[in-house]
């Protein structure tokens, strides 16, 4: 997606064919949390970007092509650290663990815990009922609805995790709380759109309504 008007965002662009790593490093030196993956594509430059992010040991949320790039590179898997949370759907989890989707779908908790055990990272495994695993605990999220199975919904979840960490919520707590907020926001969106017409932007609007009601 080409950048559109978003006045509240500070943007630093890059040329995928002539990427300047120093530009990324400059951002990593001041940021509190990193969300990487949605829309970046796969390839050597993207893998180098992910490697550089992991070197800074920052709280990091990895989704979509971030997970796909790591799945292709055992070297990157070895650089994962305890401040990382991945947010895969079943297909991404299948590639990450090199395990059939059907096997993962029938053993969500088992494979969520396997990610934590093997790589010492948190995992939000997205399905009809999302399974969240941290170092010591496992949670099943019950909020949300089938209308949220729409393009960009997972990207919204990635943003919620990163936003919670950015405002000071402890890393494990943010991992657990974000899917619940995401689901509740989707349920709020159901008050003014149907399941069949729900878009990711509706979920974002649901977040605004949800937080206003909490004040």
Which residues does each PLM region occupy?
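N-terminal loops that bind phosphate or other acidic moieties
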Residues: 52, 169, 193
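Short, well-structured alpha-helical segments that form the helix of a local strand-helix-strand
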Residues: 108-117, 171-186, 200-208
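Short, small-residue alpha-helix embedded
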Residues: 95-96, 150-181
């Amino acid at each position: 997606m080409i950048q559109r008007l978003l006045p509240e965002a500070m943007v630093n662009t890059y040329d995928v064919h002539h990427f300047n790593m120093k530009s990324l490093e400059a951002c990593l030196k001041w940021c509190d949390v990193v969300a990487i993956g949605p829309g970046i594509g796969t390839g050597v430059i993207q893998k180098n970007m992910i490697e550089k992010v992991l070197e800074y040991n920052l709280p990091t949320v990895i989704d979509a092509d971030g997970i796909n790039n790591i799945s292709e590179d055992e070297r990157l898997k070895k650089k994962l650290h305890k401040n990382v949370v991945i947010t895969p759907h079943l297909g991404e989890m299948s590639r990450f663990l090199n395990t059939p989707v059907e096997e993962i779908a029938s053993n969500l908790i088992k494979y969520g815990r396997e990610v934590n055990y093997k790589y010492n990272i948190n995992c939000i495994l997205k399905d009809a009922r999302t399974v969240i695993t941290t170092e010591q605990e496992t949670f099943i999220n019950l909020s949300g609805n089938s209308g949220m199975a729409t393009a960009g919904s997972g990207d919204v979840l990635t943003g919620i995790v990163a936003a919670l960490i950015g405002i000071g919520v402890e890393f494990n707590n943010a991992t657990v709380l974000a899917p619940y907020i995401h689901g509740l926001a989707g349920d709020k969106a159901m008050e003014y759109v149907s399941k069949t017409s729900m878009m990711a932007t509706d979920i974002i609007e649901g977040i605004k309504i949800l937080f206003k009601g909490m004040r």
